[in-house]
Amino acid sequence: MRLSEIKEKIIKIYGKRSWEKIEESYEYKVYTGTEKEQISALIRDVYAIQYINNPTEKMKLEIVKQNGDAIKLISNPSEEMQLEAVEQRASAIEYIYNPSREVQLLSVQKSGYNIQYIKDPTEEIQLEAVRQNGIAIKYIKNPTKKVKLEAVKHNPFVIKYINNPSEKLKLLAVKQDGYVIEHIDNPSEKVQLEAVKKNVYSIACIHNPTDKVIQKAIKEFDIDDTCNLKYILRFIKNDLNEKDSKEDEV
């Protein structure tokens, strides 16, 4: 049935005003309007592009400008479309197959977390991601030494996401924030000392601190401060308990 015939029937049954309302609707414009009218309709509902036969490049570009996620509705989007989509919504890269270097960079520069959507990212992309957000390293498989170092520089606490961190990384982390030692397994005496040097209270996060570390902490504490005195007494108590335990074993 032709459009003219449909129009005639609707007017006959429902009246002229009913047809006018249909013509005014954005759905009608999506199906029958000019390119300008269709674009205007798509601005209201980007997903309506699914109902347009052979949408133009201009239409495709317009919908990703409105909603980056709409890139998933477009087959083989151009790089310009990809960039517009990621500019509007950085995580839209999730829906882009084999994004270019420029698209990847733009996405991770907006949010390092988006590296989780990039397959086999280069070291360059990894570095940009952790610079934007150190925690992005948790989404990187087998990060290089350079990437690990950059991530810890930007956020020392991300060391907890790094498998078997080197002594160099541990030292870099605790030199920025002593409390990071809580996330380091079996820290060496050198790492413990650096943590306490940065923040004496971080000794509370160290399991079995060495005598040298305890002595360093006590020297740093203000003995006249009641809070500090409690810390010192606790160390003495723990030390005595450990000695008693060892004697009992003998």
What are these regions (language model features)?
Residues 2-250:
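Alpha-helical scaffold segments
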